[in-house]
């Protein structure tokens, strides 16, 4: 019994002494850790380019045309148009219609908000990140965010503002 208690005590001491060591906290090999990312102006520009890339995805571009031009008199539906597009042309926006999902626009808005949050922090860290570049990047992020909200409000009127 005395040996079992000694063994358990040794195991407990051994586990408690290694549980707080830094060697157990591994950084992921295939992901970028947030603390290591926002260090220079190229990080800000890459996230901003990601926002542009998300905006020019087929999901966003198609919805821009469908929500704008197809609902106006500039384009008309045809008999061969899918039912979902015919519903939009008749201004029948249903939650079951895949073309009425606006999550891709919020992806762009999220990226723009991320740039607006972290760009000033990067400007404090990186001496090569000029004030004029910071303001230009912030202006681009605001413009992207405004464009997305313009399409969302034009099509759906009341949308969440984040």
Predicted ranges, named:
Residues 72-84:
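Active-site segment of extracytoplasmic enzymes that catalyze sulfate/phosphate-ester chemistry
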Residues 20-71, 94-95:
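Membrane-proximal, proline-rich intrinsically disordered regions
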Residues 45, 49, 53-57, 81-156:
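Conserved, well-structured interaction surfaces
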Residues 1-29:
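Bacterial Sec-dependent N-terminal signal peptides
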Residues 20-23, 76-78, 105-108:
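Long, intrinsically disordered, low-complexity segments
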Residues 158-162:
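Short coil/linker segments at helix-helix boundaries
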